[in-house]
């Protein structure tokens, strides 16, 4: 099997896939989601792997390839060492510039996050291009894939959760609230006023950005959302056509189809 790992700023997602043909797509057989911890040791990663695989009744010996997207580089070396110890193969670190599935037509391709590139690969392969990929994570990102399949660029805004945390931290009387939509956009108390501003505010942001980007990409651009909070926004707008929670993992999986079932792949420099 293939193990795909998406190391994000807030959460790390892992998925196990059965390898298929070069054009194959398949949902992960098992996924996990854990909090991203800075400065984990190889032993700590190893304990995590052992616990997850044991509970899922999957043998680590079945893992023949590991591919990683990481936006937390300080963990890369220890993570690679843990993969070598647990799965006896060196992981391949996916980046926007070491793949040939997505042409990157930005001014500085090396600055494109590996997670955005992997999500764009999966979204355009699954749903076609042009595509706008909206990721609701630590940041809210809008990635633009042109009609010919090239990645043109993105817009980046503060994420929903960090916006809430910043608002509460900088105000004396505003409480933490459940992230859910109130019945009315006009809040009748502090809690519903906050919920309206947060949920419907981000819905409005999403709709507005999609309108602007469709003017440049084409009105037929598909809208694909991912990230832990995508469902919350998607429930309150009609512009999001597809929600795929495992989009980055699926992009890594598709990328891995072109790799050998490898021992001795390249780890971080």
What annotation goes with each model-predicted range?
Residues 49-65, 210-221:
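Phosphate/pyrophosphate-binding loops at sites that engage ATP/ADP/AMP, CoA/4′-phosphopantetheine
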Residues 2-6, 67, 131-135, 224:
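Short glycine-aspartate micro-motif
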Residues 1-5, 36, 40, 163-269:
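ATP-binding/phosphotransfer module of carbohydrate and carboxylate kinases, centering on a glycine-rich
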